[in-house]
A protein has these predicted regions:
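N-terminal Rossmann NAD(P)H-binding glycine-rich loop of SDR-like oxidoreductase domains
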Residues: 7-29
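Rossmann-fold scaffold of SDR-type NAD(P)-dependent oxidoreductases
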Residues: 12, 79-88, 129
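Conserved glycine-rich Rossmann-like NAD(P)H-binding loop of the short-chain dehydrogenase/reductase
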Residues: 30-43
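Conserved residues in the N-terminal Rossmann fold of short-chain dehydrogenase/reductase
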Residues: 38, 65-66, 106, 200, ...
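Conserved Rossmann-fold cofactor-binding substructure of NAD(P)-dependent oxidoreductases
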Residues: 63-84
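Hydrophobic/aromatic anchor residues within beta-strands of the central parallel beta-sheet
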Residues: 64, 104, 127, 167-170
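Conserved Rossmann-fold NAD(P)-dependent oxidoreductase catalytic core, especially the SDR/UDP-sugar
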Residues: 87, 91-147, 151, 155
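Strand-loop microenvironment adjacent to phosphate/nucleotide-handling motifs in alpha/beta enzyme folds
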Residues: 151, 155-177, 181-346
Length: 346
């Protein structure tokens, strides 16, 4: 990882699943320092002790900063001397954001504005922001706040030279076994002899591992241009398929799956690339790149100039991507350390 040699990386919301995955990936490399910025001192203390036990020889590379992305002063305090930022801080629970939408705006929209403002002021070289498929065609408060976050990112990228600060965004689907995701809940339900609860068996969701989430961010870091939104071509599955896979791995009864109905703000399927974005998107193999629209507000010159280019890409959603079967989902789950650890406890 030569790009990170002797560099300082700041991760906002760094005590979450993504932050832990980044630490596992980078801590033993020649990176100089990784700063964890978050508002929960208990989670920071837990993370500190965990890495002191797991990787004692390099744990001193981790520096902890208590603060909130809503507070510009605390963000700036953590930003001094930082080379790169992975911005993962967010409110991401869909039902909670439905009841407290302004809180989602404060963290996901205004908090992102604070991070980018501080990054530009401090001369940070690269900022990669984490978004979600729920930002595409949003129907809920969380998705709407993330869609606005993406607009802030693109707008902010227009105000600064990419040679000074490059600002990119990644958009991805459900990360399996991440904090607050459904699979750990199902495992607990099986172990306690309770029914597995699913909202709708035909609902589809993109699925990816934490390692794949980190890989997407690194792809954006290395190949993205300022203002880009980068999307991974992730597979998907139905909730029924996912629940059956978990049952088979953990000895659950597939007849004991209980349908509880869709929760506040949920969609039947998710979209990673919209039809509108397809007009300017680029196919990059395992990824799509949605470049920033670099036109200004003076449209007259564009009308005169014209543009005859057409794109053959179509909307990419969890209904038209590759749908995995039970065996394929089981194989994907077995690749996760969390699943192997939980199976070892049986």
């Amino acid at each position: 990882m030569s790009l990170f040699t002797n560099k300082t990386l700041l991760i906002t919301g760094g005590t979450g699943s993504f932050g832990n995955a980044v630490l596992n990936r980078f801590l033993a490399t020649d990176i100089a320092e990784i700063r964890i910025f978050s508002r929960d001192e208990k989670k920071q203390d837990d993370m500190r002790h965990a890495f002191q036990l797991k990787m004692p020889e390099v744990a001193d590379k981790i520096k902890f900063y208590i603060g909130d992305v809503r507070d510009l002063a605390s963000v700036k305090n953590a930003m001094y001397g930082v080379d790169y930022i992975f911005h993962a801080a967010a409110l991401k629970q869909v039902p909670s954001c439905e009841f407290f939408p302004i809180e989602a705006v404060k963290t996901n929209v205004l908090g992102t504005e604070n991070v980018l403002t501080a990054a530009i002021d401090e001369g940070v070289k690269s900022v990669i922001c984490l978004s979600t498929d729920k930002a595409a065609y949003p129907v809920n408060a969380m998705g709407t706040s993330k869609a606005m976050m993406e607009k802030v990112i693109v707008a902010k990228s227009r105000t600064v030279s990419p040679e000074k600060t490059k600002i990119c965004c990644t958009r991805y689907g459900n990360v399996m076994c991440s904090r607050g995701s459904v699979i750990p809940l199902w495992i607990d339900q099986i172990k306690n002899g309770q029914p597995i609860t699913i909202t709708d068996p035909t609902m589809t969701r993109f699925i990816m591992s934490l390692d794949e989430a980190v890989a997407l961010v690194l792809f954006a870091f290395e190949h993205g241009e300022s203002g880009d939104i980068l999307v991974q071509k992730a597979p998907a599955c139905t909730l029924q398929t996912q629940a059956e896979a978990v049952c088979e791995l953990f000895g659950g009864d597939k007849r004991n799956i209980k349908v509880i109905g869709i929760r506040h703000g949920e969609k039947m399927y998710e979209t990673l690339l919209t039809n509108e974005e397809c007009a300017g998107a680029m196919d990059m193999g395992n990824f799509y790149r949605v470049p920033c629209d670099k036109r200004g507000l003076n449209y007259d010159k564009y009308f005169k100039q014209g543009d005859t280019t057409r794109n053959t890409l179509t909307e990419f959603n969890s209904n038209n991507t590759e749908l995995l079967n039970v065996e394929q989902v089981k194989a994907k789950l077995l690749s996760l350390q969390y699943i192997r650890d939980e199976m070892g406890k049986q």
